[in-house]
Amino acid sequence: MTQAKVRLLSFDDYLAYDDGLDKNYELINGELLEVPPETEENAYRAFSLLLALSEFVDIRRIKVQKLEIEVFAFPGMPLNRQPDLTVLAEGHIEQMADINQMAIKRFMDPPLMVVEVVSPYSSQSEANYRRDYIDKRQQFEQRKVPEYWIVDPTAQQVSVLVLVNGAYQASVFEGSQIIQSAVFPELSVTANVVLSA
């Protein structure tokens, strides 16, 4: 018996969809594409950053995985993203309660910050690299997310992209360098701490 492909026309359709399997999906051109679960190492890196950030922002506003962000769908790219870590803006918790979803829709303000941990890759042409460095950068920039961190264990660096006049400006931090955050200037964490797992 063959199973029909599920067609979802909108982000709202996607949020309402439940196949009971607790899997992660991306919505591309109306079709669901299953994405693999995050590795334990990536989750650990996100949680360690959550602990550092919790000194400066209410921990309820820091979400590790499972939060959906509606983004602009460029050709061949998904309509949704599930960052490894998201820092919500003021009002997001109330707005998400109003829609009864762990989601930031396009009519809402963007999150203050998103963080992606890059899965291992051997060349910059591989999907893991392109997804975080190119595709998500383009979508988060278009969504006007003020700060986007790319935590890259393969390259042993943390890139901090800050939105300046509608475009991201990148700074790269390695080793014992203290990461400079525009959103959280008082944050004092080194690249080594964020990269360790």
Predicted stretch roles:
Residues 1-197:
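Gly/Pro/Ser/Thr-rich low-complexity, intrinsically disordered segments predominantly at protein N-termini
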